[in-house]
Amino acid sequence: MKNIHQTAVVEDGARIGEDVKIEAYAFVSKDAVLGDNVTIKQGARVIGNTQIGDNSKIFSYAIVGDIPQDISYHDEENTGVIIGKNATIREFCTINSGTHKGDGLTRIGENAFIMAYCHIAHDCLIGNNIILANNATLAGHVELGDYAVVGGLTPIHQFVKVGESCMIAGASALSQDVVPFCLAEGNRAYIRSLNLVGIRRRFEKEQVEELVKAYKFLFNQGVSLKDQAGELFEKTNDTNVKKMCKFILETTRGIPLAKGRD
């Protein structure tokens, strides 16, 4: 059963799942796909080739799927937004469609919790179980790993990669890549420590201990981070530690470290 308010605009061609609720003055475009049990609240807009997974909620005046804020974009076809199941997108968020400079899609995984006034720009790749606090701003092509958390009022520079289970503190400004399982803070943000709160929520005690040992080895003051990562990658059998090392070895924007580190 669909519950569509008489003042809502749902264009012909939109694919609407079961038990969908579309409130007053909301808009859903002809190319949109809404999964089952989706709620589009008052005044929200779902535009263009946008897919929203089951059990997701788009709150009032959020705009999902509008064209990118990119001066090189010229109405390319086959671009859009894909959002996984159980997403919560709060008031006044903006999520832009992808461009042909990426694969054409802005992607957000399952169980995303995106608070009011956040912005996700074109071609971002967002993992599962992420949290963006109020006014977090992701520029184009940013990648967030699973379980990443971005604090309020924090901008992230285009093409930056944030690893899984990272925490970027509120009111920071991030312009380089953050190693999985780490916490970064400051303007400009640099890595301060492991994200112990986050990893203790996800992993067993023994796994946490391996990450603590790896962090101490990698971030030893005065030693090259990439040299340490290369050495540890060959020595360890721990999957999470290998992820940390691989990330460091493959970064293109560099890792933000305290002054005096390389």
Curated annotation (Swiss-Prot):
A GO MF label: acyl-[acyl-carrier-protein]-UDP-N-acetylglucosamine O-acyltransferase activity
Keyword Repeat among record annotations: yes
GO CC terms, sorted: cytoplasm; membrane
PROSITE patterns assigned: HEXAPEP_TRANSFERASES
Keywords: Acyltransferase, Cytoplasm, Lipid A biosynthesis, Lipid biosynthesis, Lipid metabolism, Repeat, Transferase
Presence of the UniProt keyword Cytoplasm in the record: yes
Signal peptide: none
Catalytic activity: a (3R)-hydroxyacyl-[ACP] + UDP-N-acetyl-alpha-D-glucosamine = a UDP-3-O-[(3R)-3-hydroxyacyl]-N-acetyl-alpha-D-glucosamine + holo-[ACP]
EC number(s) per entry: 2.3.1.129
Record localization: Cytoplasm
Pathway where it operates: Glycolipid biosynthesis; lipid IV(A) biosynthesis; lipid IV(A) from (3R)-3-hydroxytetradecanoyl-[acyl-carrier-protein] and UDP-N-acetyl-alpha-D-glucosamine: step 1/6
Domain of life: Bacteria
One example of a Gene Ontology biological process annotation: lipid A biosynthetic process
Record Pfam families: Acetyltransf_11, Hexapep
Function as written in the Swiss-Prot or TrEMBL entry: Involved in the biosynthesis of lipid A, a phosphorylated glycolipid that anchors the lipopolysaccharide to the outer membrane of the cell.
Binding partners and assembly: Homotrimer.
Similarity remark: Belongs to the transferase hexapeptide repeat family. LpxA subfamily.
PANTHER family the UniProt entry points to: ACYL-[ACYL-CARRIER-PROTEIN]--UDP-N-ACETYLGLUCOSAMINE O-ACYLTRANSFERASE, ACYL-[ACYL-CARRIER-PROTEIN]--UDP-N-ACETYLGLUCOSAMINE O-ACYLTRANSFERASE, MITOCHONDRIAL-RELATED
The protein, known as: Acyl-[acyl-carrier-protein]--UDP-N-acetylglucosamine O-acyltransferase
Native organism: Campylobacter curvus (strain 525.92)
